[in-house]
C-alpha cells in the first residue's frame, strides 16, 4: 500500500498525475457552471419574454406573438452580451491596475 498520496509527498510523475486530475476537475466544474448559467439565462429570458409577448396562451402562437418573442429574446441576449462583456472588461482592467499597484510596492 502506497501512503505517499496521504502524506502529500509523491514522486514527480505522481505529482503530474495529481496536477492533471486537479486541472481536469477544474475544467469540469467550470464547464458545469457555464452550462448552469446558460440554462438560467435561457429560462429567465423565456419567462420575461413569454409574460410580455403572450397575454393569453392558446393552442398556437399568432404571427404577432412569434415576432414579439423573437425580438424580445434577441434583445435580451444582446443586452446580456453587452453587460457581460463590459463586466469582464472592467474586472480585467481592475486586475491589471491591481497588478501594477502591487508591482510598484
Swiss-Prot record:
Keywords: Chaperone, Disulfide bond, Membrane, Metal-binding, Mitochondrion, Mitochondrion inner membrane, Protein transport, Translocation, Transport, Zinc. Disulfide bonds join 49-72, 53-68. It comes from the Eukaryota. The keyword tRNA-binding does not apply. Residues 1-23 are annotated as: Disordered. The keyword Nucleotide-binding does not apply. Pfam families: zf-Tim10_DDP. InterPro entries: Tim10-like, Tim10-like_dom_sf. It is found in: Mitochondrion inner membrane. A motif (Twin CX3C motif) lies at residues 49-72. It is a peripheral membrane protein. Belongs to the small Tim family. Mitochondrial intermembrane chaperone that participates in the import and insertion of some multi-pass transmembrane proteins into the mitochondrial inner membrane. Also required for the transfer of beta-barrel precursors from the TOM complex to the sorting and assembly machinery (SAM complex) of the outer membrane. Acts as a chaperone-like protein that protects the hydrophobic precursors from aggregation and guide them through the mitochondrial intermembrane space. The twin CX3C motif contains 4 conserved Cys residues that form 2 disulfide bonds in the mitochondrial intermembrane space. However, during the transit of TIM13 from cytoplasm into mitochondrion, the Cys residues probably coordinate zinc, thereby preventing folding and allowing its transfer across mitochondrial outer membrane. This is Mitochondrial import inner membrane translocase subunit TIM13. It comes from Mycosarcoma maydis. The lineage of its organism: Eukaryota, Fungi, Dikarya, Basidiomycota, Ustilaginomycotina. The gene is TIM13.
